[in-house]
Swiss-Prot record:
InterPro entries: Pentatricopeptide_rpt (IPR002885), TPR-like_helical_dom_sf (IPR011990). The keyword Transcription regulation does not apply. The keyword Transit peptide applies. This is Pentatricopeptide repeat-containing protein At2g18520, mitochondrial.
Amino acid sequence: MTSSRLYLRFLRRFSTATGIDSQTTAYPGAITMSKAKSKLRKVQDPDKALAIYKSVSNNSTSPLSSRYAMELTVQRLAKSQRFSDIEALIESHKNNPKIKTETFLSTLIRSYGRASMFDHAMKMFEEMDKLGTPRTVVSFNALLAACLHSDLFERVPQLFDEFPQRYNNITPDKISYGMLIKSYCDSGKPEKAMEIMRDMEVKGVEVTIIAFTTILGSLYKNGLVDEAESLWIEMVNKGCDLDNTVYNVRLMNAAKESPERVKELMEEMSSVGLKPDTVSYNYLMTAYCVKGMMSEAKKVYEGLEQPNAATFRTLIFHLCINGLYDQGLTVFKKSAIVHKIPDFKTCKHLTEGLVKNNRMEDARGVARIVKKKFPPRLVTEWKKLEEKLGLYSKGNAAAVSSSSQTREVLDQEREDDV
């Protein structure tokens, strides 16, 4: 009865928000899964995300694709703090015959975790018997993932100890252990994670490259460099299948040393048949930025075929720190065109610098783009910043809307969306 009411609420909320009948296609035109994923990554408006999700959720037969679409949609809703809508959306799926399939229900558990609604995830896990869904390590791992996404790191060891004893069909596997390791690493206890790894070896449970990489990164982040290097040697001696991700963890630490050290490791990557990726070059760029070598950092950026959000955030931030606001503005405009604008703090640095240098029109242009891209909660905070900087008032509304650089960026965005 409860799930039926939530389902009806979801349909009413969805239809009202989008102006589209719930029985019709929610997004205009035929959308391939690839196109839908692209749009979900770009869109911040939660109602638009719901519309896209309804299209792909009805047509997709891939559990992985459906999970990806669901989690992205939930994240958009969570950013706007629309938790009742998240509950209505997820609970409405209980009416789907697939609910008796453990992988399907596990997606719902994980999605609650994406919204940091762990209590709801736990409740759904406990309802599996009533729903007629088998409970194995698959759903247990989904619950652990929800716990991690909710930043409840201390709960993971508790669940790991209690649930295999409570439920006969749950036997932790290498994925379960990997999440246990991550919980200790994320709570700043890499030494405890190492103990779990040794316990896995004794029990004959495979220590995956992901688990090794998680511990390695935590050791570096906690300043345990010697221990990290020892673990790296152990990984090499054991013949672990080293990949870009684990090398990038080493590059993360090398970026604190010097650009030369980063380049040495990148050459080592190439020598073992790995091609440095965007993340790798981001660390090289960061190393230059830390040393104040902004010309070299920009060369790295300009050589990237597909800079990611971290690329733009790092470069813009350091350009601003070095007083290069004009260059920062140019990079910001590029980030907006490719839907990868940096975080609130970085945009704040840029805008404050432009105002300080009497670039009010450019500052308003940045503000216009930020308000279009950020979720409602951050837009509210941004408007407070505008008022503080003297950017926002009834008298300058026309100036904001007439910003040529803003129109240029937004027009380019529309072309990219076609």
